Amino acid sequence: MMNNPRHNIREVRAPRGDKLNARYWTTEAPLRMLMNNLDPDVAENPNELVVYGGIGRAARTWNDFDRIVASLKTLGEDETLLVQSGKPVGVFRTHADAPRVLIANSNLVPHWATWEKFNELDKKGLMMYGQMTAGSWIYIGTQGIVQGTYETFVEAGRQHYGGNLKGKWILTGGLGGMGGAQPLAAVMAGACCLAIECNPDSIDFRLRTRYVDEKAETLDEAMEMIERWTKAGEAKSVGLLGNAAEIVPEMFRRGIRPDMVTDQTSAHDPINGYLPKGWTMAEWREKRVSDPKAVEKAARASMRDHVEAMVAFWNAGVPTLDYGNNIRQVAKDEGFENAFAFPGFVPAYIRPLFCRGIGPFRWAALSGDPEDIYKTDAKVRELTPGNTHLHNWLDMARERISFQGLPARICWVGLGDRHRLGLAFNEMVAKGELKAPVVIGRDHLDSGSVASPNRETEAMKDGSDAVSDWPLLNALLNTASGATWVSLHHGGGVGMGFSQHAGMVIVADGTPDAARRLERVLWNDPATGVMRHADAGYDIAIDCAKEHQLNLPGILG
């Protein structure tokens, strides 16, 4: 593509307040959330339409962005916009309870589902990488993964350190849109964190948004901070400027032993997401365009070195976990047979939550007023009496998390709670307690909406890790149930060929019609997660299905 239709220095921010720019709130909501994804306070590289996760985009080109906006502004309440890999391709007559937008991003026939084929199509302008919430317009900034990371660290602390992470520290890499959650999540869990990041702008972004506490230029400087904080029992974090592929092995050689090791570099994308050892940032940026194959080769070799060091920590008795960026797979493909020695975070720490349909429920205030979020926080507390763990999370979130773009909240709840919260929020809008409607969605990383054998569905009890019928059924059911927009993606989190996943978002606009849709969608969506795990034979899921009287004929009999 000549003259790069993906580059445009313009500032996009979602409208605020209760004035419509589209014809209905069900079309205003996707309009605002699309724009919010590209807010400079939200997106990692908004001028290139990149929201997070390497090259995870909100729209294919700026012309496509403009066409999507124009379509949403005129879309009828009985029409549905179809978006194919970030390009608006059709508007069709449906009905009022149908989704207003249906999105398919980055999907390839399995035999051709490789980065090589994707990059070929991407260069021709035929596709874009949607990541998970980038191309589905429900990214809320780094907050979106904070609680999941917090839950992981807390459970790891319970399993390995008797539930107390005071005086402990976590080593990780990556401070991008997802990895940037790690330092704050660690601090919330009571630990210190040393996060290695090669891009100084990313460290500065996390400092500005209060996700990391300090910045260090050298390993010695960072370790001095870690030693001082852990000795004092303080929970603080530092972003170390450098290359994880160089520094993690060096730390092991020096005899430095963290209390936990993980990684959240963008290793899922070996061309755009991972700086090779010995390369400068300038060299990397130039060669990604001039010689992408050389970049990929060097990055993959560097990832092997990185994983070898992580396995060395694991073998030395340090709890080590893969945080879902597919770095182990790359290392194995590069000849390191023991790359999967340490577990992924889902089977190690999170799966019992998924068995009950508990996952990253989130909502955003279309008014733009933080008070609307604080009021909904209070409503969540009111409707979940006795859930002290959740209440503690809400307290910490209000104190520590800075809103990026439209105010939003992440809150891990499951089947039986999501629909109650959605109905309560809708009633608050109806009564005028909130200044404008709210949108309710989730990450694609949820209990019933993803097939990802190296991440969410790793080591399933029945061996069904790679079965991707489940996210397809989830998307179909959410469409039939009346979600406001539904998305079906490929390759999020772990890269091309390694995942399929679905998303949904629904608007609470205070109307009775919205209430009916909310009750259906926010019950059915988490119920698919319980169904999926019950089918795999997990007793927790089977008990949850029975408790909620789910009708699962081929599973419960």
Swiss-Prot record:
Reactions performed catalytically: 4-imidazolone-5-propanoate = trans-urocanate + H2O
A single GO molecular function term of this UniProt record: urocanate hydratase activity
**UniProt keyword terms in alphabetical order:** Cytoplasm, Histidine metabolism, Lyase, NAD
The UniProt record lists the keyword tRNA processing:
no
Q: Which residues form the active site?
A: C411
Q: Which segments does the entry list as coiled coil?
A: none
Where is the protein found, in the record's own terms? Cytoplasm
Cross-referenced InterPro entries, in alphabetical order?
Urocanase (IPR055351), Urocanase-like (IPR023637), Urocanase_C (IPR035401), Urocanase_central_sf (IPR038364), Urocanase_CS (IPR023636), Urocanase_N (IPR035400), Urocanase_Rossmann-like (IPR035085), Urocanase_sf (IPR036190)
Pfam families per the UniProt record, alphabetical: Urocanase, Urocanase_C, Urocanase_N
Q: In which pathway does it act?
A: Amino-acid degradation; L-histidine degradation into L-glutamate; N-formimidoyl-L-glutamate from L-histidine: step 2/3
Would I find Manganese among this entry's keywords? no
Tell me its EC number(s), please: 4.2.1.49
Detail which positions bind NAD(+): 53-54, 131, 177-179, 197, 243-244, 264-268, 274-275, 323, 493
Q: Which cofactor does it need?
A: NAD(+)
| GO cellular component labels | cytoplasm
Role according to the record: Catalyzes the conversion of urocanate to 4-imidazolone-5-propionate.
Q: Which family does it belong to?
A: Belongs to the urocanase family.
- Matching HAMAP family: HutU
This chain's protein is named Urocanate hydratase
Q: Which gene encodes it?
A: hutU
